[in-house]
């Protein structure tokens, strides 16, 4: 049905989005299309209404004869339109646009967007390949009202080989498997996972011994999916796998013989080998290399001496098994000379507030904030305002030459300006980040809530950020590292890619990831405990041979 009085924010803008008019490939592009520009995906309603009613003396709107408005003539291809026909006269979308024009193109600035959406049903199972499943998208508004917005929402399949979905949320099953479905509506996002079961007649579950909670969570899903896992790998396979995963090196012939000749039960000696390798010199070297990649240790930015100092610093942290939250906090709050405090090299590498923020959120939270620098994130909840509010935490980071550098410099090319070998990182008393759209200084603010200890009025902005980011209550911090370690050891993360946590990219086993995250936090952010827990699971020790 067409609303009696269409509201631009809640009725018209969703239609414009669904028709594709404000997409990045159309009028939502940076410079618009053919002289007409809209805000990308409608994130700025005031700008869009003015574009329709004020630009070019208001030629796009005809209040006296709404059907003759260029806005409608273009969308119906009644006049030439490079974007083709987007709507037909008489259809609901057309009527909503027409009624809005007929009633004066009003914009109620107090009108609120949906605060959240939900997809119904949650995690449905399609029993037979070829069957259909209708999804509904329901929007919830701040005043407590809700309504079905399936027609206006976008629903997309993340695995089109398993299931596809049409414009009105009707899912078609293609083959056995799982397909995450992402629904988005006016900046709100929700997901569900479709399971296509297929013919599993004759399936019988065989009870298996769970080595720990990881196996219990995995078995719950195997039962639901009607899958029998592979058997355990042989001792020969296990010893090679473990050495490669924990030390990056194949075991020596002597190590293999010693393990195979040990008369102890297989399970017992496997646990002993895990405990033996976790924390040894080769283990420390291997995981130091991984962190060298993550922290971008590079002579180009630090010089040979600075790169060596930075690497030696976090090698000692890994060797001492520093809790992950403390490790991250030392980096985030680092100041002083990167010669005396090598952790400060993190800032010497990145330097600019926006680059520091993008890298920090990507590395420690597995979120991608670079997409919302120029506009609201098109496929996530992150906004352009949040980009600059987060960057503001690094706005006062500054650098000055460390006298111990003497006459040693790095860079000096046309691309890389010359900088002292060692620099002192410090926090200025002033300095702000300017918001691209508003031109005003951004006020530091977190993109989501997380309880943390600390007084906002004490310490630097980075201290406050570090307390928030490393909090046990932060939904992304521990989860992102747990998923990263799982991916390193298992070859694929519970979330893939490893550094892309978002609503439209749900974990393959949410219950397992939740338990692992909670266990990691309760262990005191002990990375070695996490690695041991994964390696001692039945899941880790399964054979590569298909059941």
Regions found by a protein language model. Give the residues of each.
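Inter-heme linker and motif-flanking segments adjacent to c-type heme-binding CXXCH motifs
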Residues: 106-109, 143-145, 189, 378-382
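Primarily short, surface-exposed interaction patches in extracytoplasmic proteins
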Residues: 206-282, 287-547
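Acidic surface patches and DE-rich sequence motifs
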Residues: 141, 166, 435
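Short secondary-structure subsegments characteristic of cysteine-rich extracellular domains
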Residues: 86-98, 311-312, 505, 509
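A eukaryote-biased signal for short, well-structured alpha-helical docking elements
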Residues: 95-108
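Protein kinase-like catalytic domain
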Residues: 16, 22, 27-30, 101, ...
């Amino acid at each position: 049905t067409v609303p009696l009085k269409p509201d631009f924010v809640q009725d018209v803008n969703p239609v414009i989005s669904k028709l594709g008019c404000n997409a990045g490939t159309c009028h939502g592009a940076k410079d618009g299309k053919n002289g007409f520009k809209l805000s990308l995906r409608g994130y700025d309603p005031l700008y869009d209404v003015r574009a329709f009613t004020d630009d070019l003396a208001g030629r796009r709107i005809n209040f006296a004869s709404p059907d003759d408005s260029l806005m409608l003539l273009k969308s119906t291809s009644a006049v030439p339109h490079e974007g083709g026909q987007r709507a037909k006269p008489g259809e609901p979308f057309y009527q909503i646009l027409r009624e809005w024009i007929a009633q004066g193109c009003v914009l109620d600035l107090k009108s609120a967007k949906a605060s959240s959406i939900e997809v119904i049903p949650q995690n449905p199972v399609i029993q037979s390949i070829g069957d259909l499943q209708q999804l509904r998208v329901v929007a919830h508004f701040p005043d407590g009202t809700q309504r079905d917005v399936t027609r206006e929402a976008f629903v997309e399949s993340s695995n089109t080989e398993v299931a596809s979905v049409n414009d009105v949320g009707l899912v078609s099953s293609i083959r056995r498997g799982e397909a995450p479905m992402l629904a988005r509506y006016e900046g709100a996002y929700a997901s569900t996972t479709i399971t296509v079961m297929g013919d599993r007649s004759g399936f019988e579950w065989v009870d298996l011994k769970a080595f720990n909670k990881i196996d219990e969570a995995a078995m719950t899903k195997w039962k639901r999916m009607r899958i029998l896992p592979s058997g355990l790998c042989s001792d020969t396979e296990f010893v090679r796998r473990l050495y490669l995963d924990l030390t990056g090196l194949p075991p020596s012939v002597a190590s293999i013989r010693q393990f195979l000749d040990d008369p102890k039960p297989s399970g017992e000696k496997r646990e002993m080998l895990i405990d033996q390798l976790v924390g040894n010199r080769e283990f420390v070297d291997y995981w130091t290399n991984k962190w060298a990649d993550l922290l971008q240790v590079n002579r180009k930015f630090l010089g040979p001496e600075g790169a060596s100092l930075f690497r030696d610093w976090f090698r000692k942290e890994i060797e001492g098994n520093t809790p992950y939250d403390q490790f991250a906090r030392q980096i985030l709050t680092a100041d002083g000379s990167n010669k005396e405090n090598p952790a400060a090299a993190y800032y010497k590498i990145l330097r600019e507030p926006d680059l520091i923020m993008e890298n920090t959120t990507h590395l420690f939270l597995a979120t991608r904030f670079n997409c919302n620098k120029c506009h609201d994130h098109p496929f996530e909840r992150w906004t352009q305002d949040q980009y600059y509010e987060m960057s503001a935490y690094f706005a006062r980071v500054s650098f000055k030459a460390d006298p111990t550098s003497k006459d040693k410099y790095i860079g000096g090319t046309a691309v890389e300006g010359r900088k002292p070998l060692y620099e002192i990182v410090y926090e200025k008393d002033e300095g702000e980040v300017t918001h691209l759209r508003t031109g005003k200084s951004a006020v530091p603010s977190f993109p989501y809530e997380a309880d943390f200890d600390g007084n906002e009025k004490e310490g630097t902005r980075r201290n406050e950020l570090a307390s928030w980011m490393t909090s046990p209550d932060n939904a992304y911090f521990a989860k992102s590292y747990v998923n990263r370690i799982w991916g390193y050891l298992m070859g694929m993360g519970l979330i893939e890619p490893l550094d892309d946590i978002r609503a439209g990219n749900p974990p393959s086993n949410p219950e397992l990831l939740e338990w692992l995250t909670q266990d990691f936090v309760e262990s005191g952010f002990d990375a070695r405990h996490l690695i041991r827990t994964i390696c001692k699971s039945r899941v880790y020790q399964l054979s590569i041979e298909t059941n």
